[in-house]
Amino acid sequence: HTPDMVQGAILAFRAASNARDVNCVVFTGAGDKAFCTGGNTKEYAEYYAGNPQEYKQYMRLFNDMVTGILLCDKPVINRVNGMRIGGGQEIGMACDFSIAADTARFGQAGPKHGSAPDGGSTDFLHLFVGITRAMASCTLCEHWSAHAAVDIGLVNKIVPVLKAPDGRFIGNPMVSLERFDAWGNPAYGAFKSGTEREAAKAAMAGCTTDLSLLDAEVEAMAYKLSLTMPDCLAKTLESVRKKKLEHWQRN
């Protein structure tokens, strides 16, 4: 994300809150590679990091966007079209619902790339996955597959986006669907390695990406939300979001 993008998002969420013809907000990224992989580290290294006040300004802008999502009067669906990493993970968690491509990846990057995950993950990631997983994610920066993310409660649903040459949708072959490893540790959604990984890469070689099923699931969620009473829905969103806001406002 860049300052221009963040400023635009802040204004967009405010406008959506006030628009009577808006049923819900869908927050997504362009293309099929990533929803968001965090801040432009080159940008703030060159422009912001030389002055503490400038870095504070940079982070305040991002924080205002997260707050804008949490206070939006309309439900917010995160359409995860690819990687949701770093600041992207934090933006996504601020949303009310997450529907993801099964090729998406989730996690943090801060301690490995010169920052800290203080834009939401240190505040409320544990509300989704528990303090043990949250600590590991924030410090080790190891990523979850989309399958692991839905299994641990980080997202609502995943859908296939890879299309084989014969036109069939196939599930992401890069992840294991085994529930446990040889020692009994949870392993659902673990990334394959070694020869299994090479075989999975070969299976993907002839595939194309088609996001039509992802769009259909997002549309279905939006339709379900449209069947609720707007005022009652807004009050319910406000009440459930209090749990995230309680932790976020300590930031």
Show where each model-derived region lies.
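Conserved CoA-thioester-binding segment of acyl-CoA-metabolizing enzymes
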Residues: 1-28, 53, 212
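Hydrophobic alpha-helical membrane-association signature
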Residues: 5-9, 58-61, 91, 214-217
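A general structural signal for well-ordered alpha-helical segments in protein cores
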Residues: 6, 62, 122, 215, ...
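Terminal peptide-recognition signature
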Residues: 8-9, 27, 40, 75, ...
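Catalytic-core regions built around general acid/base machinery
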Residues: 12, 61-73
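Glycine- (often His-adjacent) and acidic-residue-rich active-site loop
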Residues: 29-65, 84, 112-114
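Crotonase-fold acyl-CoA enzyme core
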Residues: 68-230
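Short alpha-helical scaffolding segments that buttress acidic/His motifs in well-ordered protein cores
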Residues: 137-138, 236-240, 251
